[in-house]
Protein backbone atom coordinates (compact mmCIF):
# COMPACT_ATOMS: atom_id res chain seq x y z
CA UNK A 1 0.00 0.00 0.00
CA UNK A 2 2.81 2.39 0.86
CA UNK A 3 4.51 1.67 -2.49
CA UNK A 4 1.28 2.41 -4.39
CA UNK A 5 0.89 5.69 -2.50
CA UNK A 6 4.48 6.69 -3.35
CA UNK A 7 4.00 5.90 -7.04
CA UNK A 8 0.72 7.85 -7.11
CA UNK A 9 2.39 10.85 -5.47
CA UNK A 10 5.27 10.84 -7.98
CA UNK A 11 2.86 10.63 -10.93
CA UNK A 12 0.77 13.46 -9.50
CA UNK A 13 3.86 15.61 -9.06
CA UNK A 14 5.05 14.97 -12.62
CA UNK A 15 1.64 15.70 -14.15
CA UNK A 16 1.27 18.96 -12.21
CA UNK A 17 4.69 20.10 -13.47
CA UNK A 18 3.69 19.30 -17.05
CA UNK A 19 0.43 21.23 -16.67
CA UNK A 20 2.25 24.28 -15.30
CA UNK A 21 4.78 24.18 -18.12
CA UNK A 22 2.09 23.89 -20.79
CA UNK A 23 0.34 26.98 -19.41
CA UNK A 24 3.49 29.10 -19.80
CA UNK A 25 4.11 29.10 -16.07
CA UNK A 26 7.38 27.13 -16.34
CA UNK A 27 9.88 28.74 -13.98
CA UNK A 28 13.12 29.70 -15.70
CA UNK A 29 16.50 30.99 -14.65
CA UNK A 30 17.55 32.13 -18.13
CA UNK A 31 16.08 32.54 -21.61
CA UNK A 32 17.91 29.35 -22.70
CA UNK A 33 15.33 27.35 -20.70
CA UNK A 34 12.39 28.90 -22.60
CA UNK A 35 10.71 27.64 -25.79
CA UNK A 36 10.58 30.38 -28.42
CA UNK A 37 8.13 28.53 -30.70
CA UNK A 38 5.16 30.13 -28.91
CA UNK A 39 6.24 33.66 -29.85
CA UNK A 40 4.96 35.36 -33.01
CA UNK A 41 7.02 37.24 -35.60
CA UNK A 42 7.98 40.63 -34.17
CA UNK A 43 8.42 39.24 -30.65
CA UNK A 44 11.13 37.35 -28.81
CA UNK A 45 11.13 35.06 -25.79
CA UNK A 46 12.36 36.29 -22.40
CA UNK A 47 12.63 34.91 -18.89
CA UNK A 48 10.98 37.78 -16.99
CA UNK A 49 11.68 39.10 -13.48
CA UNK A 50 9.16 36.59 -12.06
CA UNK A 51 11.14 33.74 -13.69
CA UNK A 52 8.35 32.94 -16.16
CA UNK A 53 8.94 32.41 -19.89
CA UNK A 54 6.98 34.95 -21.92
CA UNK A 55 7.10 36.85 -25.22
CA UNK A 56 8.32 40.45 -25.41
CA UNK A 57 7.98 43.02 -28.19
CA UNK A 58 10.70 43.10 -30.83
CA UNK A 59 12.34 40.47 -33.00
CA UNK A 60 15.75 39.31 -31.77
CA UNK A 61 18.91 40.04 -33.73
CA UNK A 62 18.65 37.82 -36.81
CA UNK A 63 14.84 37.73 -36.56
CA UNK A 64 12.37 38.91 -39.22
CA UNK A 65 11.34 42.56 -39.48
CA UNK A 66 9.52 45.02 -41.75
CA UNK A 67 11.06 48.07 -40.06
CA UNK A 68 13.38 48.93 -37.17
CA UNK A 69 10.32 49.23 -34.89
CA UNK A 70 9.89 45.45 -35.22
CA UNK A 71 13.34 44.79 -33.70
CA UNK A 72 14.44 44.38 -30.08
CA UNK A 73 16.30 47.66 -29.66
CA UNK A 74 18.32 46.38 -26.69
CA UNK A 75 19.80 43.46 -28.63
CA UNK A 76 23.08 45.10 -29.73
CA UNK A 77 26.35 45.75 -27.89
CA UNK A 78 27.03 49.30 -26.61
CA UNK A 79 29.01 50.59 -29.62
CA UNK A 80 26.37 49.64 -32.21
CA UNK A 81 22.68 50.08 -32.98
CA UNK A 82 19.85 48.02 -34.47
CA UNK A 83 18.65 48.28 -38.07
CA UNK A 84 16.17 46.28 -40.12
CA UNK A 85 18.29 45.11 -43.05
CA UNK A 86 15.75 45.07 -45.89
CA UNK A 87 18.41 44.65 -48.58
CA UNK A 88 19.80 41.47 -47.03
CA UNK A 89 16.43 39.81 -46.48
CA UNK A 90 14.39 41.71 -43.85
CA UNK A 91 16.13 40.77 -40.63
CA UNK A 92 17.25 42.67 -37.53
CA UNK A 93 20.98 43.25 -37.34
CA UNK A 94 23.54 45.38 -35.49
CA UNK A 95 25.73 47.99 -37.19
CA UNK A 96 28.56 50.01 -35.61
CA UNK A 97 27.76 53.59 -34.55
UniProtKB/Swiss-Prot annotation:
It is found in: Secreted. Keywords: Antimicrobial, Disulfide bond, Fungicide, Plant defense, Secreted, Signal. Disulfide bonds join 28-47, 34-53, 39-55, 65-84, 71-92, 76-94. Its main location: secreted. The keyword Plastid does not apply. Transmembrane segments: none annotated. GO terms for biological process: defense response to fungus; killing of cells of another organism. Belongs to the DEFL family. This is Defensin-like protein 301. It comes from Arabidopsis thaliana (Mouse-ear cress).
Amino acid sequence: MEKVTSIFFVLLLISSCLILRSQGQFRCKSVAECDSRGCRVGTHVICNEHHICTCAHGSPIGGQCDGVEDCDLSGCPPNSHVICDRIGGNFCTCVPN
